[in-house]
Amino acid sequence: MKLTLVILALVACVTAFSVPTQKVKIADKNFLEKQKFLFEIVHRIDEPLMFEEWIKMGQKLITDKAQYETFDFYMEKLWESYKLGALLPKGEFFGALVKTHHKQAYGLFNFFYYAKDWETFVRNVAWARIHVNEGMFVYALTLAVIHKPEFEGLILPQIYEIFPQYFFNSKFVYAAEKFDYEVFSKLTMYEKEYKDILYKDYSEFTGNFYFYTKDWKTWQWYKMMGLDQEWYVEDKYFLRENLSQFVNDPKYVDVVKGLKKFYMPVDYTRDIDFFNDETKMTYFTEDLGWNAYWYYLNMDYAFFLNGKQFGLDKDRRGEYWIYNVQQILARYYQERLANGFGEIPEFFWYKQIEYGYDPQLIYYNGIGYSYRKNYYDFYTYGKFEMYSQIQNFFSRVYKVLETGFYKTADGQVFDLHKPEAIKIVGNYLQGNADTFDKYFFNYYYLLAHMYFADVDYNDMEVFPNVFLNFETMLRDPFFYTFYKKFTDVFYTFKYYLKPYTQKDLFYEGITIKDVSVSKLVTYYDIVDFDVTNLLNDKMTFVDGQYIWDKALLARQARLNHKPFNFEFTIDSDKVQKGVVRVFLGPKFDEYGRVIPLDYNRKNFVQIDSFVYPFIAGTNTIKRSSKEFSWTAEDRITYTELYKYVMLASEGKYDFPLDISEPHNAFPDRLVLPKGWEQGMPMQFYFFVSPFAETYEQFSNFDYTYSSGVGSGTRFVDTKPFGYPFDRQIDESDFFVPNGFFKDVKVYYVDTFAKYFEKKYTQFGTFDYSIEY
């Protein structure tokens, strides 16, 4: 578990090379009580609250205005809606981007955020847990825990542990919700005799492997082991890459003592109803970490939060958000190349969407998510008025960029052909609360998502759709097609800025002589995700204390990579500080043609950035992918966190505030594209620029357990995100001694190939000796 700060951007990771040593804080009794409350209040979120302590606290919503720092319009409207029975009912689908849902969620968030003390907060949260829609409750609570200053260090389980229904297919969710330990125990006795006969001679299956695995894909690893999609006892440990960090902790034995664990192999979406090439990419687009990253980005920089009040303007929120969009598309494009696909399809207003999508998800109320058929025509089947508004937004933005200035409704004029105008353009594209013209730009973002989800302006009860929540929208290939419109505006803005000159890029006295890179290897490994919130059995309490004695796990194959290293050789003519940036991009397109640098700059992902104190002479810098501070390894699970809190509450464990990876970290395993067995050509670009900032990074927050959202000191310098790839490139000026390109290859290794090569002696059981 890292102690370093995770910087929230996919590539805007601008951190120090050497983070100053700081003692990790240990939670006191007061902190543990608060953490226990947060873990219990979201437990089995789609069921009635069963903790008597919190039921008593949640008898009424505190409406005394004296108990709040502010009591605003949205809070009044929420309270009125509740009294009139007009709140979104419990059990109904909640969409964060449905206008009617958003307004109620805003009011609920304010009841949480503006509470003057912990008791008022607890009473409001407990009341909302009992009376408010489950999805709306989690959305508002997540925002409050992230943004309320006095809650620094407190955490919630990951969103995929609170709502596994948003991340796993309906087949798995049904099985988890029906799980009954007593029935399971009896079934295993009968199944053992059956399996002993079935798997007695594995050689009988080798001649018919094609038929047995006719729809097999890499992530259906369980078929190669003779397993099926059913529940199995896990009598060893939670599978994850960084397992040793936990099992080597002597206290960990106490944590898992008496805990019964059950896992089920789980698959990704595949083409069941209609054929679609895009299903080849579902291991990536449906990756839990990939989707959770986008969710938490939009929680940290929620579009409706005021930048000045929450400090988000200090973090350059608009620029930061649109740059993340650009980087997500760049990373997605790299994965497309690894699978033989080309450019992300363009979005045209009056053209059919070639690829449909069936998420195969089911909401916790039993209603399946809506799907889109191949060659779907939004213009014909959608709501024309909303469609026109979305078109008008983009037309207006292009027009003001072309004219070079923008005049707001109150008469202010802004020059949009200056670099600092990216703040304005980014705010407009996100449609956030800091846009200068709120009459036009504020709600277009909501309307766009509502339109593509077939939701009308005033709809309250709507069908589930992946486009209405941040945690599900990256699953749909159409997300990348539509969001390409956002980056087109971004590139249009950059087009009017002159390319950097050699004088701009040159760092006097610094020369990158060479950078060696270790072999880049990707593979599929297997991991357990905690889905215990799907359990429906009876909860057991002893003396008022909940006994958490069972854990359900979703065991899934996911993309990963071997750790890799850089060794920089950099000459400096004097002692000085510099910022080292590392980018990874493709070399060729899907046809094997070299991609021109000026165009290819859009496809580079920044994977590292750090400050280094150069000495006079030759500097040798060694850096590992494990040191990337913006990424996270596999997280400690919800079940384990609760167990640790209870152990600490009994005085048997020192609970460190940095026990879990920051909520907004990007998954380390997705830094590299899948690659090819013969090696996929890629290229690194290394660039060193001067360090000349007046503020000290991490100076106003504790980096050991806080991500510093809204602090203004999260980033190591004030260069544009993506610098120097953020503008058009003039190749006659771009190549400078302090920049260096390195050709590499990414090799994919099939870790499951051994199951084809020889008899698998453990057929019908999980192979713990599998080498990743």
UniProtKB/Swiss-Prot annotation:
Keywords tagged on the record: Glycoprotein, Secreted, Signal, Storage protein
Glycosylation-annotated residues: N242
Protein name per UniProt: Larval serum protein 1 gamma chain
InterPro entries: Di-copper_centre_dom_sf, Hemocyanin/hexamerin, Hemocyanin/hexamerin_mid_dom, Hemocyanin_C, Hemocyanin_C_sf, Hemocyanin_N, Hemocyanin_N_sf, Ig_E-set
Family under the similarity heading: Belongs to the hemocyanin family.
Signal peptide span: 1-16
PROSITE patterns assigned: HEMOCYANIN_2
Tissue: Larval hemolymph.
GO terms under biological process: energy homeostasis
Domain of life, source organism: Eukaryota
Keyword match Isomerase: no
Tagged with keyword Signal: yes
Molecular functions (GO terms): nutrient reservoir activity
One GO term describing the cellular component: extracellular space
Record text on subunit structure and interactions: Heterohexamer, composed of three subunits, alpha, beta and gamma.
Subcellular location: Secreted, Extracellular space
Pfam families associated with the record: Hemocyanin_C, Hemocyanin_M, Hemocyanin_N
Record gene name: Lsp1gamma
